[in-house]
Amino acid sequence: MAFVFPEHRDGLQKFVNTRVRRRKTELYKTITNICTVVGELLKHVEALEPRFISSLKLVDGRYQGVKALSPQSFEVHLYLNQMGVFNFIDEACPPGCAMLKLSDERKRSMSLWTEFITASGYLSARKVRSRFTSLVSEAIRRGKLQNQIRVSIDNHFSAKLIVLERYTVDLIPCFRCGSIWPQNGCCWPCCETTWPSQSIIDSIKLQGFSLLAKDPFPAAKGVTTEGDAWQVNFTEAEEILFATAGRKLCLSILKTLYDQHLDLPGKPLEYIHLVTLLLHECEKHPRESEWIEDTLLDRINGILLQLVSCLQCRKCPHFFLRDVDLFRSKSKQMLDVAAKQVWNIARDVATNPGSFDSL
């Protein structure tokens, strides 16, 4: 462990007590405002089509299914009823994706989603997304919500909205897949890792993952099934892995640094890149003693330096999904700009005891 100047530790503590906590408060207010408007919209969607029941609910002070991608960009995952007639398939699928196939062709008429099933028996993410997007547009008109919500004009294939003229919100239909785990497309857990414990791994696999009706990762372009495939999502697993105080605080610090310095034009970086590198850092440093106050600066700087390396190599492997590169769709020029910015922050944190006073 590197020596930590007292000024460095005090500066980080002040940063946490002021900027990190302020960000958390402001984010909560933002999500509350967004969900108030979106919740009203989803009531009208449900009135038009009862199969799309809103799952946007406040539970223990948090809205379920809401995910911040950046300070002004959010996803809302709307969980649908699968009716139990589909099998999960991740063989011969686009990287990071899976398919839902009728378990028995005779059950086609029993499915809640009959008209979205292809001739081959697959539940098409594209068809579900298209129908849902049409319903959202109609619900905005019927609910007279045009002053608060509008469909993004640069997007015609999903329910991406501009809310309160300030925030981008992508409404995504999805399914929960519990008590199963991807066998072919997933590279986690690694047999050599000592983190997390086997009991936590078992808990994560029991809880499962989600399938999102959104475009496949850029690496998947050109695959014939990409429109019908569902993107595999591990948000629930990430929350379990970041449950301990030190790791959770580290992520909050990284996101605060992002909001202040790394939310760059063209979005070369998003929160998902920080989450991914933090997960890799957790594998490198599995012991709880490596995530206490005295070691947190080492962890933060290690993640920043690893991010610089990924930006320079123009590759950021997904933590869970095999063959998925999170930088694949980013321009080289934007990644180079981001690398310089991250390097400046990493150098300041490593060499300047008062760095967090100015960050």
Where are these regions (language model features)?
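N-terminal regions immediately upstream of nucleotidyltransferase
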Residues: M1-F74, L78-S134, E138-R141
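Acidic carboxylate-rich catalytic motifs and surrounding loops in phosphoryl-/glycosyl-chemistry enzymes
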Residues: S54-G61, L145-F157, H318-D325
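Charged, low-complexity, helix-prone segments enriched in Lys/Glu/Asp/Gln
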Residues: L27-T30, I34, N233-A237, Q341-N344
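Terminal (often C-terminal) interaction modules
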Residues: M1-V20, N33-I53, L262-P265, H285-L359
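Phenylalanine-focused residue identity feature
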Residues: F3-F5, F15, F52, F74, ...
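Catalytic cores of NTP-dependent nucleotidyl/adenyl transfer enzymes across multiple folds
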Residues: V66-K67, S103-Q312
